[in-house]
Every structure is written in structure tokens, then in C-alpha cells.
Amino acid sequence: MTQLSSSDVPGMGRRQFMNLLTFGSVTGVALGALYPVVNYFIPPRAAGAGGGTTAKDELGNAITATGWLSSHPEGDRSLVQGLKGDPTYLIVEGPDAIGSYGINAICTHLGCVVPWNSGANKFMCPCHGSQYDATGKVVRGPAPLSLALANVSVENDNVFVSQWTETDFRTGDKPWWA
């Protein structure tokens, strides 16, 4: 074999080197900027056996059933972070029982957070006056639909919220939110 002389070997010129350096830098910045966007669409990993997400308090701490039941009386409806971080009401059904379903607190009219009015025993939207009964069924408009439901389960004292796919027990219809 013959060796090529150094003058016959093509070298990388300054312009080509700068082009490669610029391309690499722009690609790195673009991938770095896209990471949070892609990460947004990946579901959270903290899940129960049913594929739900861990219910969290207003500070983002995981909720334990014993802790929740010790600080909330029977019949209480209090907000937690549920599916996709949406505000969801956990229902205390007894001194040692959290309800098997949660109620999404987002109004079906314009998306306001609907507070629980314990005096009237219903959810009342402050934005346009929609009202929902204790189960989240719409009783007065302008909201067109009942509040969405979520399954609630307790496993090893951890509270999990998962997608509701069963028939809506309030209307007998398929869930509109699934």
C-alpha cells in the first residue's frame, strides 16, 4: 500500500469546522428546550396497581389514608391534586373510610374551580352560578354536564386516584370525560 502525502489528504477547513460547531450548538440547545415539552406528555411514575396517580395535598406531599381520616370528619369533601394535577375532591364516608370515587372540581361550564358549600350541601360555582349536588351531578346551569369522576383506592395506606371508565352512576350514561 502506498501512503498518501499530507497534501493529498483533504483537511477540514475553518468554515466547515465553524459550521459543524454551530450546528452542534443549535441542536444541543433545541434538544434541551424540547425536553420539558416531551416530559410534559409522559405520565407520572408514582402509580398504584390500578395505574392511578398518588393523591397529593396542596403542598405536593403524598396523602396517607390514616393521616387524611384523622384530620377530616365524616362527610367532608376536601381538595387534593388528582389526575393530571387537577383539583379533585376526596370524600370521607366514615371514621375509617375514604369514598371509592373522587369528584373533579373543574366546572363543566367555563373551567372554574367549584368549591364545596357544606351549609347548602352542594358544590356552587362562583363564576356563573352552576350548582352540583353532593355527588357532582349538575342541578342548576349554565353548566351542561356533571362534574367528572375519578376512582379512589387505598393501598398500603397510600391514596391513589385513577381514571373513571365505568358507567356514571349519577346518570347511567357512559362518562363524557373518558
UniProtKB/Swiss-Prot annotation:
NCBIfam families: Cytb6fFeSPetC, PRK13474.1. The Rieske iron-sulfur protein is a high potential 2Fe-2S protein. Keywords: 2Fe-2S, Disulfide bond, Electron transport, Iron, Iron-sulfur, Membrane, Metal-binding, Thylakoid, Translocase, Transmembrane, Transmembrane helix, Transport. Belongs to the Rieske iron-sulfur protein family. The 4 large subunits of the cytochrome b6-f complex are cytochrome b6, subunit IV (17 kDa polypeptide, PetD), cytochrome f and the Rieske protein, while the 4 small subunits are PetG, PetL, PetM and PetN. The complex functions as a dimer. It comes from Parasynechococcus marenigrum (strain WH8102). It comes from the Bacteria. Component of the cytochrome b6-f complex, which mediates electron transfer between photosystem II (PSII) and photosystem I (PSI), cyclic electron flow around PSI, and state transitions. Its main location: membrane. This is Cytochrome b6-f complex iron-sulfur subunit. [2Fe-2S] cluster binds at residues 107, 109, 125, 128. The keyword Metal-binding applies. It is an enzyme of class 7 (translocase). GO terms for biological process: photosynthesis. Pfam families: Rieske, TM_PetC. GO terms for molecular function: 2 iron, 2 sulfur cluster binding; electron transporter, transferring electrons within cytochrome b6/f complex of photosystem II activity; metal ion binding; monooxygenase activity; oxidoreductase activity, acting on paired donors, with incorporation or reduction of molecular oxygen; plastoquinol--plastocyanin reductase activity. The chain crosses the membrane at residues 20-42. Disulfide bonds join 112-127. Its cofactor is [2Fe-2S] cluster. Its EC number is 7.1.1.6. It is found in: Cellular thylakoid membrane. It catalyses: 2 oxidized [plastocyanin] + a plastoquinol + 2 H(+)(in) = 2 reduced [plastocyanin] + a plastoquinone + 4 H(+)(out).
